[in-house]
Amino acid sequence: MSGVFHLNLTKAQLKGATLAIVPGDPARSERIAKQLDNPEFLTSTREFTSWLGYINGQPIVVCSTGIGGPSTSICVEELAQLGVRTFLRIGTTGAIQPHINVGDVLITTAAVRLDGASHHFVPLEYPAVANFECTTALYNAAKAKGIEPYVGVTVSSDTFYPGQERYDTYSGKVYRNYQGLLKQWQDLNVMNYEMESSTLFTMCSALGLRAGMVAGVIVNRTQQEIPNEATIKQTEEKAVSVVITAAQALLS
């Protein structure tokens, strides 16, 4: 019988794991887990696909969050109930600064809370910030891999299209409150858009948990909107190598 409402997992299945790697894509969970020692499939229900693996004999759970803050909040809450205390998000992203290239790696220190889920945990004035130890581990891991990461602020939006001011849509329209925001975030030196970090950071900070995030750039919004499969694969591999190395450091 499951020990939590949605993930269909029990504490015994996690074997004492206190660190989770949380991608958005369920298929990415398997690809990450298979780079760990003794990977074991646990369960898949809705957007949540879970694996267990080991680094230097220590268990790590890999569990997909799905897209956006609401499902991320469920994943984090239920993994915390099962004993996880550190969350490393790995994702793909669209950069908005012209000097950031496709294939680059971004480490998020804080997020603009352009979402709704984080407001269910903390008031608007509360910042969405990553844990310092997690951020440092991700940065050092990237450098150790010969990767020069960009480090900074992310916009975290509930929606992929209007919230990120995309006009390549069925209607071609963006609600006026979001018109011009892309240029505003560029002027404020924000690196990129994604959809989970604001919920992850605010929730973990409020609950006394640790969270960090690394993302691979698969498009630059100043250049193109649609990525190609080869780029996604190569960029994902770089970001995954960083998150696994960071996990090892945080467990040591």
UniProtKB/Swiss-Prot annotation:
Disulfide bonds: none annotated. GO terms for molecular function: uridine phosphorylase activity. It catalyses: uridine + phosphate = alpha-D-ribose 1-phosphate + uracil. GO terms for biological process: nucleoside catabolic process; nucleotide catabolic process; UMP salvage. Belongs to the PNP/UDP phosphorylase family. Catalyzes the reversible phosphorylytic cleavage of uridine to uracil and ribose-1-phosphate. Homohexamer. This is Uridine phosphorylase. It comes from Haemophilus influenzae (strain ATCC 51907 / DSM 11121 / KW20 / Rd). The lineage of its organism: Bacteria, Pseudomonadati, Pseudomonadota, Gammaproteobacteria, Pasteurellales.
